[in-house]
Amino acid sequence: MESIRRNSRKEGIKERIFLTIGLLVLSRLGTFIPVPGVDHDAFYQSISTNPIVTFLNIFSGGGFASIGIFALGIVPYINASIVIQLATTSIPNLEKLQKEEGEAGRQKISQITRYRALGWAAIQSLGVSFWVRPYVFNWDSQFVVQMTLALTTGSMLIMWFSEQITEKGIGNGPSLLIFINIIAGLPKLIQQKSNAISSTNQTTELVVLASISVYDSRIFIRDRRYYILQTVGRHCKQTSYLPLRLNQGGVMPIIFASAILVLPAYLGQVIQNQFVLKLVTLLSPNSSDKNLYLIFYFSLILFFSYFYASLIINPNDVSQNLKKMESSIPGVRPGKATTDYLQKTLNRLTFLGALFLAFIAVVPSIIENITSISTFKGLGATSLLILVGVAIDTSRQIQTYLISRNYENIMK
């Protein structure tokens, strides 16, 4: 800690930290700026016990319940990112932009993602403007336009905040924004739990919550260790190592899966159809029968773990790079055999990591169903995993940045 404090005084790291903190504070302030024309007291009382709104508030830090200008949060941008990243694996032009055109191609993909996020934010904002109609003082076309513009603009600001944090700050912007929104709800949760300690069952609830929190943290740290694969150079005969992580995607599969589960909730609030509402209730983490939700959530985490691993590591590219460096894996022929070996190894690691991640995400809900102890009301395992994962990723990025700065100073 002393070395971190000493190094943080160096030029660069302080600016990044201050920028990150400043943008996170601004993102929180926006949730308290209400959209005009809505009876916010009546609206809050009406939806305060709505489990779907409670789920949506995870991503907006309470902004959805108060209909602040940042009510949509980072969800439109995450949804757009999911669509574009899926498209890069199936649309040749996008795949070419990502792999062959370098930084210019990635910037074009980022621009496409922004436009898609803008469109999705406008659609969601329009839907919310119709949803709050019973609580609006003077609902007309002018109000619909004003609210759509306000929520869309707020979502675009959040998107810009996230990009600035990623590029010029510390950590992953979208992850940190979700992180700070979850943290914002902790004081209220702690107060509720403190006031509730009056019986053995309630004390047991806190013990289980603390135990699962520690359990989540330990498992999540363990599954992020590196898997070492030995390589040998042909001429110099030096031994080096190719690191493969058990969980390539980190916390992103959890965030992506949660973002997908938010979509039916949005539709359920806008489309007042009995079938849609029933489907939304079944896919809600607060539903009475969580079996369908748990199966769907488990499957989404598995899918996005494999999907994210395929984006981060391409076995064919790694094989070609090893061949160019005149290196090989002992006992494996260069070329296609190396590619197949890497793909097989990556699939096994991803499968184990995805199972760990999905299991830790759903086991608290299973325990809650069995014991009938509502341990995770307000702070589910998903939130715990996101908190732990983002904290680990951010601290690791700070350490990497400090090491690179020290190396640059030595070279100078």
Curated annotation (Swiss-Prot):
InterPro entries: SecY, SecY/SEC61-alpha, SecY_CS, SecY_dom_sf. It is found in: Plastid, Chloroplast thylakoid membrane. GO terms for cellular component: chloroplast thylakoid membrane. It is a multi-pass membrane protein. The chain crosses the membrane at residues 17-37, 58-78, 117-137, 143-163, 170-190, 251-271, 293-313, 350-370, 372-392. Component of the plastid Sec protein translocase complex, which is composed of at least SecY and SecE. The central subunit of the protein translocation channel SecYE. Consists of two halves formed by TMs 1-5 and 6-10. These two domains form a lateral gate at the front which open onto the bilayer between TMs 2 and 7, and are clamped together by SecE at the back. The channel is closed by both a pore ring composed of hydrophobic SecY resides and a short helix (helix 2A) on the extracellular side of the membrane which forms a plug. Belongs to the SecY/SEC61-alpha family. This is Protein translocase subunit SecY.
